[in-house]
């Protein structure tokens, strides 16, 4: 843009900056309102720079390369010439380029706050290696002492375990012997009980056979008596039968004689 309509607006959000360029070489630099933290400002060549530091983060001091020793990543003279060819006068072009250089330096400062130089890195690495060597030595010493302690504890535990094993072995043997003794006693008791029961069974069997023999003899005698009685009864019945036949025959002959007597008398 040319003349009185000269106006540039550079807007950067978050950690970045808002840059407003107006005609009359009036340059204002405002920190972002949406970022939390503390804004630090420096004034250089009529410009205000602002960078926000996040609150709650660790802040450490680092050696930042001085401004005069830094090299910009673009050609400022060529940029001034380019702006002049687009209608800016020399003062405006230099002002814009100076503002861009200031913004670049502010961004580099922000980046450098979280970085270290090679020398600092090497020193830090050497310090870390020294700490690691010290830790390694301490670990070796601790390892030896701990191993000695562990070895002693291990030996102590071995002895205690051996005592426990021997105690368990003795208890197992004692329990096994007691169990065997109880089993033998129970076996003897059962054998005696079985023998006694068998003896009682034999006595009962003998008594039963005796009673059976006695019963058989009694039954035989009874059968003999019954047979004798039956034979006697048969003999008696035969004798009674003969007497009855004789009586009947006599009765018949008597009746016939009476009948013949009456018959003769009737004639």
Curated annotation (Swiss-Prot):
Q: How does it sit in the membrane?
A: Single-pass membrane protein
Source lineage: Eukaryota, Metazoa, Chordata, Craniata, Vertebrata
- A Pfam entry, by short name: CCDC90-like
User: What keywords appear on the UniProt entry?
Assistant: Coiled coil, Membrane, Mitochondrion, Transit peptide, Transmembrane, Transmembrane helix
* Compartment annotation: Mitochondrion membrane
Indicate the residues annotated as transit peptide: 1-47
- The chain's coiled-coil residues are 142-175
**Family according to the record:** Belongs to the CCDC90 family.
Name the domain of life.
Eukaryota
- Annotated membrane-spanning segments are 244-266
Q: Which GO terms describe its cellular component?
A: mitochondrial membrane
Q: What is this protein called?
A: Coiled-coil domain-containing protein 90B, mitochondrial
Q: Which PANTHER family match?
A: COILED-COIL DOMAIN-CONTAINING PROTEIN 90B, MITOCHONDRIAL, PROTEIN FMP32, MITOCHONDRIAL
């Amino acid at each position: 843009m040319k003349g009185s309509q000269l106006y540039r607006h550079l807007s950067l959000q978050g950690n970045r900056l808002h840059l407003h360029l107006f005609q009359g070489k009036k340059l204002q630099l405002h920190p972002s309102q949406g970022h939390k933290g503390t804004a630090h400002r420096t004034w250089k060549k009529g410009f205000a720079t602002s960078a926000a530091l996040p609150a709650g983060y660790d802040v450490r001091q680092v050696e930042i390369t001085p401004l005069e020793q830094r090299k910009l990543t673009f050609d400022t003279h060529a940029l001034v010439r380019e702006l002049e060819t687009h209608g800016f006068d020399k003062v405006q072009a230099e002002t814009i380029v100076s503002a861009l250089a200031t913004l670049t330096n502010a961004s580099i400062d922000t980046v450098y706050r979280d970085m270290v130089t090679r020398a600092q890195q090497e020193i830090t690495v050497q310090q870390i290696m020294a700490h690691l060597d010290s830790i390694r030595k301490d670990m070796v010493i601790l390892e030896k002492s701990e191993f000695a302690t562990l070895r002693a504890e291990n030996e102590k535990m071995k002895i205690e375990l051996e005592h426990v094993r021997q105690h368990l072995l003795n208890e197992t043997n004692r329990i096994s012997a007691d169990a065997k003794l109880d089993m033998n006693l129970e076996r003897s008791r059962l054998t005696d009980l079985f023998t006694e029961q068998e003896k009682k069974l034999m006595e009962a069997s003998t008594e039963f056979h005796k009673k059976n023999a006695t019963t058989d003899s009694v039954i035989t005698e009874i059968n003999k008596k019954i047979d004798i009685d039956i034979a006697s009864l048969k003999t008696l019945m035969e004798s009674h039968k003969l007497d009855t036949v004789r009586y009947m025959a006599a009765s018949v002959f008597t009746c016939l004689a009476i009948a013949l007597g009456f018959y003769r008398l009737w004639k």
